[in-house]
Amino acid sequence: MSGQIIVINGTSGSGKSTTAEKFVQSREDFWLLYGIDHFMAGTLPARFGHHGPRAAEGIQAVPLDPADPEGTLKWRLGPQGKAAMATFHDWAGAASRNGCNIVLDHLLMSDPPFLQDMAWRLEGLPVLLVTLKPPYEVLMERVAQRAMTKKLPVEVLGEDAARKIVERLDRLRDWFYGAVYANTISDLTIDTSVHGPDDVVAMIDARLRQGPGTAFEELRKVWPRP
């Protein structure tokens, strides 16, 4: 029997990582925990990430408007980035096919085609898609209050890595919001400025009890296989 997959979608500051962690902590049954933050920080080699010297081969931040090189940035995938993201999605599928429940947080934009790739790679498996979407202003306030506390591989990224990362993320933020929330198909959408983490977990649990999610099936009707 396939394990249940829960995908928690939302941009930085939406509460997706906190929700995923609290959901697993609240359960007596067996749930694996993974997500885009784990993947980017601990699985993808730093030199191929969007702050690294070989980002063009992996996941690169490039100008949204080539005529404005100092403006908003967006993500672009190189060959290793495409292969890595496909693997990330296949891992979720492998967990389910082995009978494990898994909850993971994600940034489900359609360009690059994270949304389409995941929807098709998880075809035939039970997936519940949850989108956490607080207002833009709330997100910006939350992100502004965050401190850079991650241990950075300065031997790869350089001694001024923290400053460069903060600057790059600031320039990605507007694009992330538009790209991640462009898709309106979801099994459950929650405003985390209104509902706290415990309430969000309870709402996800209640939706699970209602039956299987249908959002990914709907997405496969909208988006061709990438």
Please place each PLM-identified region on the residue numbering.
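Hydrophobic anchor at the beta1->P-loop junction of P-loop NTPases
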Residues: 8
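P-loop (Walker A) phosphate-binding loop of NTP-binding proteins
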Residues: 11
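ATP-binding Walker
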Residues: 14
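Walker A/P-loop
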Residues: 17
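Conserved substrate/cofactor phosphate-moiety recognition/catalytic segment
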Residues: 21-83
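Glycine-rich phosphate-binding loop used to anchor ATP phosphates in small-molecule kinases
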Residues: 70-123
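Conserved phosphate-donor/acceptor-positioning beta-strand/loop module used by diverse small-molecule
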Residues: 123-146
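Small-molecule kinase domains that catalyze NTP-dependent phosphoryl transfer to phosphate-bearing small molecules
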Residues: 148-203, 215-226
